[in-house]
Design a protein with these regions (language model features):
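Glycine-rich phosphate-binding loop
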Residues: 1-16
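Structural motif
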Residues: 2-3, 24, 44
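Short, flexible micro-motifs
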Residues: 9-11, 21, 48
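Short, structured coil segments at secondary-structure junctions
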Residues: 17-19, 37
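Short hydrophobic/aromatic-enriched beta-strand-loop microsegments
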Residues: 19-26
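C-terminal binding/interaction regions
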Residues: 27-82
Length: 82
């Protein structure tokens, strides 16, 4: 999802049950949110990241699997209970 900053859409998206939306402005954030939080939606700000960087962020997000580590799985379970 894209808006000017990405903040509002990420907040709104996270109100939907089952959505774990992460606001990312760099590839490392995209990688870590997939690895550790199993984020299933990406938010970006068009006024924050340029086109080439946005493509790199999306590619990283889509190509990074969830780590499956127990501590990360527990975290996701706690998030889902909220």
């Amino acid at each position: 999802m894209i808006c000017t900053t990405g903040i509002g859409i990420s907040i709104s998206a996270n109100k939907v049950k089952g959505i774990r939306c992460a606001l990312c402005s760099d590839p490392l954030s995209a990688k870590m949110t997939r690895l550790h939080n199993d984020a299933n939606m990406l938010a970006m700000g068009a006024g924050i990241v340029g086109e080439n960087l946005a493509l790199e962020i999306v590619e990283t997000f889509l190509n990074t699997p969830f780590s499956g580590e127990e501590r990360h799985s527990r975290r996701i379970s706690l998030i889902e209970e909220v």
